[in-house]
Amino acid sequence: MVRTEQNWENSFHFFWRFIHNPLKIGALRPSSAQLCRATVKAIEPEKCRCVVELGPGTGVITQYLLNSIDPQSRFLAVEIDPVFHENLQKRFPGTAIHRGDAEDLGKWLQPQKSGLADAVVSGLPWTLFTESQCRSILAEIASCMQPDGIFVTLCY
């Protein structure tokens, strides 16, 4: 992989956020290009009308997702970290990026109005959550997905 200024900047910001908030940020650096490609392939983007990303961090996977789904498809991201959220809004203007908790996904997706997600990609730090939090988040995800929807989660 060729290191670019953007890659270095993403890695630096990610590591800096981890140092400042290790109980919320679950990785030391952003996902690799290989992981991004595998994640996108797993959700079958050509079939998706609605894609959700939870915990997008610096937006590395977000970029791959947005480049792969149909421009008419709906995309929604939820990021809890205020610095990541602000940077994501600047990097992806006009994209639905909400600041908050994954347990509130339905509030932003509003599946009763705009349909359920065909795919949910999660970069959430599951090992930092209690069992109760994991169950609550997974229940919220399930309630917002199509019955045949695809759920992909990344663990580090």
Feature locations, PLM:
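Conserved class I S-adenosyl-L-methionine
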Residues: 48-57
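Class I SAM-dependent methyltransferase Rossmann-like catalytic core
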Residues: 7, 11-46
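A short SAM/SAH-binding and catalytic strip from SAM-dependent methyltransferases
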Residues: 118-132
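Conserved SAM-binding loop of SAM-dependent methyltransferases across substrates and taxa
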Residues: 58-70
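S-adenosyl-L-methionine
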Residues: 85-111
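Conserved SAM/SAH-binding beta-strand->alpha-helix loop
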Residues: 81
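A short glycine-rich, Lys/Arg-flanked "PGG" loop and its adjoining helix->strand segment in the class I
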Residues: 135-147
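Conserved beta-strand signature within the Rossmann-like core of class I S-adenosyl-L-methionine
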Residues: 148-155
